[in-house]
Amino acid sequence: MSIRERLLATVSQYIAAYNEFDPSAMKTVRTPTCLSHGIAPTCKFTQSVEEHTRHMMLSRGVFRSVNASIVDDDTTVVDEVSRHVVVKVKIRCETTVGPYENEAIFIMAMDEEGALVDGIFQFLDTARFQQFQGRLDEAQESKN
């Protein structure tokens, strides 16, 4: 398998694990030192694997199903030398406050073998994310 094929296979495995929305599945495709970064100006964060696991566990109470898919393979960028892959992703979720859809750019840095994700930079459509966050806030306020 060429390095390009290996990198793309790792991206596919990451997306499959993302769709399971299970922290243990996510850990199988990430290095122990992998960091997740939100890079949108209104949605900035950096999480270690452990922090990401805690975040997912808390989010499981909100997300009933998650379906992420690569939007267009023609827009995927693979840099074999630096072991980076850039993909445009469509995310569809069923949540406790109804459907949530968003698009994102994932910039994924892989380990030397190209078999594990060593860092991921996510750029979400923040307008859609803020609308969803508003629905969550309204639902929480109506409970109080």
From Swiss-Prot:
InterPro entries named among the record's database cross-references: Fungal_Meroterpenoid_Isomerase, NTF2-like_dom_sf
GO biological process: terpenoid biosynthetic process
Top-rank lineage group of the source organism: Eukaryota
Further comment: In A.calidoustus, the austinoid gene cluster lies on a contiguous DNA region, while clusters from E.nidulans and P.brasilianum are split in their respective genomes. Genetic rearrangements provoked variability among the clusters and E.nidulans produces the least number of austionoid derivatives with the end products austinol and dehydroaustinol, while P.brasilianum can produce until acetoxydehydroaustin, and A.calidoustus produces the highest number of identified derivatives.
The protein's assembly and partners: Homodimer.
Physiological role: Part of the gene cluster B that mediates the biosynthesis of the fungal meroterpenoid acetoxydehydroaustin. The first step of the pathway is the synthesis of 3,5-dimethylorsellinic acid by the polyketide synthase ausA. 3,5-dimethylorsellinic acid is then prenylated by the polyprenyl transferase ausN. Further epoxidation by the FAD-dependent monooxygenase ausM and cyclization by the probable terpene cyclase ausL lead to the formation of protoaustinoid A.
PANTHER family with a match to the protein in the record: AUSTINOID BIOSYNTHESIS CLUSTERS PROTEIN F-RELATED, AUSTINOL SYNTHESIS PROTEIN F-RELATED
Family per similarity comment: Belongs to the trt14 isomerase family.
Official protein name in the record: Austinoid biosynthesis clusters protein S
Organism: Penicillium brasilianum
Source lineage: Eukaryota, Fungi, Dikarya, Ascomycota, Pezizomycotina
